[in-house]
Amino acid sequence: MALNLQDKQAIVAEVSEVAKGALSAVVADSRGVTVDKMTELRKAGREAGVYMRVVRNTLLRRVVEGTQFECLKDTLTGPTLIAYSMEHPGAAARLFKEFAKANAKFEVKAAAFEGELISAAQIDRLATLPTYDEAIARLMATMKEAAAGKLVRTLAAVRDQKEATAA
């Protein structure tokens, strides 16, 4: 479908605005995936706070220029589906990783997080980042465990001291 200049400018403006507020970006090749499957992916993306769009590579190069996602420029070949994580940095990576397991033709190209390019082979690094709630839960469990351990050591020291004075 031919796009006129105004349409191209509108696409660049829209995606640029989204990119400014995004925490991470993931690019993928969705050739061979059925429309039904893509619709499911888009629905899951909306629920996870992920903005997804198929954008021409020339327009996408303009979008990422001067942003933290500029490192993705070299991966922009062939049909490109870009996903921006808006709420959690690992949301798009997690979504694409799970979708790729179920759909062999779906190929994750790369991801970008804080200006760093993450290859498709290392996408697990980003996909396994804990959410805010998970991180707080882990911290609280660690703190609780440390406090319990300190109490046990203190009680053992008191016991040892009493045994030493009794003997």
Swiss-Prot record:
Keywords attached to this entry: Ribonucleoprotein, Ribosomal protein, RNA-binding, rRNA-binding
Gene Ontology biological-process entries: translation
GO terms for MF: large ribosomal subunit rRNA binding; structural constituent of ribosome
Keyword Transmembrane helix included in the entry's annotation: no
InterPro entries tied to this protein: Ribosomal_uL10, Ribosomal_uL10-like_sf, Ribosomal_uL10_bac, Ribosomal_uL10_bac_type, Ribosomal_uL10_CS_bac
Keyword field contains Ribonucleoprotein: yes
GO cellular component: large ribosomal subunit
Protein family (similarity comment): Belongs to the universal ribosomal protein uL10 family.
Its job: Forms part of the ribosomal stalk, playing a central role in the interaction of the ribosome with GTP-bound translation factors.
Subunit structure: Part of the ribosomal stalk of the 50S ribosomal subunit. The N-terminus interacts with L11 and the large rRNA to form the base of the stalk. The C-terminus forms an elongated spine to which L12 dimers bind in a sequential fashion forming a multimeric L10(L12)X complex.
Protein's UniProt name: Large ribosomal subunit protein uL10
